Structure formats: C-alpha cells, structure tokens
Curated annotation (Swiss-Prot):
Reactions mediated catalytically: XMP + diphosphate = xanthine + 5-phospho-alpha-D-ribose 1-diphosphate
GO biological process: purine ribonucleoside salvage; xanthine metabolic process; XMP salvage
Keyword Glycosyltransferase: yes
EC number: 2.4.2.22
Protein name: Xanthine phosphoribosyltransferase
Protein residues bound to xanthine: L20, N27, K156
Length: 190
C-alpha cells in the first residue's frame, strides 16, 4: 500500500533496528483518512471470506479494525488488556507478551460477543514475533470460532511472526512489509 509506505517514510521514526515509531499517524495520533484507506484495503482483501466479526487488541489495533468493520459491515471486538468492573464474567482469557513494552498482559473478550458461528478477521497494527496474533487466535479458538485470516498494517518481516502464523496455516495480509530498519532507514520488502 503505497500511501502507507509513504507515510511511514515521511513520519515514521526508527528508534532501533527493531523498533519503528509511528505515533504520528497510527498508535497515538491517528490519521483518519489513512485509516479509512487501510480499512478499505483490508476489506478488499477479505471481502469474499464471509467474515462475521473483526477481532483486534486494544488500543492501537482499534482504528484500522473499526475502519475495516465499517467497510465490511461487521462488528469489531477488541480484546481488553485488563479486567474492569464491567468485564468480569464469562470471558475468554489469554496472555500476550508485548515486544515494544517488554511486559506480559492478560487479555480478555466477553463470551457473549464471540461464538462458534463466527468467522473472524484478526486485525492489528504491527506483526513482529506473532505473540499478540497468537493470543488473539487463542481467544477466538476458545469461542470455537473460525479464522479467515490476519490483516496487519505494518509487518516487521525481519522478525518471525509471519513464518509462525503461516506455518500454522493462517493467511497473513500485510499492507506494508518492512524488510529492515538498519542504519535508521526503513526498507520495504515490496
């Protein structure tokens, strides 16, 4: 997706050979026009899959997921990273390790929103080592729902997330595939 790659080049900041900061348009400040185009791109790639729900993880996956949900006409569920007074009974629960924050979190989805009749598209802002995706897949599996695939805004192709997911038979569609962040420069795969 050329417009996304251009945005990464112009506004992304390489913090290290493993960390790309995109808080100017994706995971702190959000560019609504770009997210609308991201949502459309995911909808076009998964339109014929019979998707009934989109699942993401709070917080940075919400904007692209909502835009894809709007395009596909389906609800969006975001896994919460902590339990609150309103999210405490009949939950699907999993653990996820955050590469960026270097912490483990418990995530949860209410069982009333996801069931075995659902065919799910997973959307997230980044794919690195696949830990967040695997935690979401675990939650979806607890519900007995099926998975159409994973839509990733930015993939760090130099990490093993894609290989892990594809080896388990999951379809992965990434809008921007980063080959390298070496020397403070973003290099794309395609």
């Amino acid at each position: 997706m050329d417009i996304l790659k251009d945005k990464i080049r112009s506004e992304g900041i390489v913090l290290s050979e493993h960390v790309l900061k995109v808080d100017a348009f994706l995971n702190h400040q959000i560019d609504p026009q770009l997210m609308q185009q991201v949502g459309h791109a995911f909808a076009m790639r998964f339109r014929d899959q019979g998707i009934t729900k989109i699942v993401t993880i709070e917080a940075s996956g919400i904007a692209p997921a909502v835009m894809a949900g709007l395009e596909l006409g389906v609800p969006v569920i975001f896994a919460r990273k902590y339990q609150s007074l309103t999210l405490k009974d009949n939950l699907y629960i999993s653990k996820v390790f955050s590469f960026t924050k270097q912490t483990e979190s418990t995530i949860a989805i209410s069982a009333k929103h996801l069931n075995a009749h659902d065919h799910v598209l997973v959307i997230d802002d980044f794919l690195a080592n696949g830990h967040a995706a695997k935690a979401l897949i675990d939650l979806i599996g607890q519900a007995g729902a099926s998975i159409a695939g994973l839509g990733i805004v930015i993939e760090k192709s130099f990490q093993d997330g894609r290989a892990l997911l594809e080896s388990e038979g999951y379809r992965v569609e990434s809008l921007a595939r980063v080959k390298s962040l070496a020397g403070g420069q973003v290099e794309f795969l395609d």
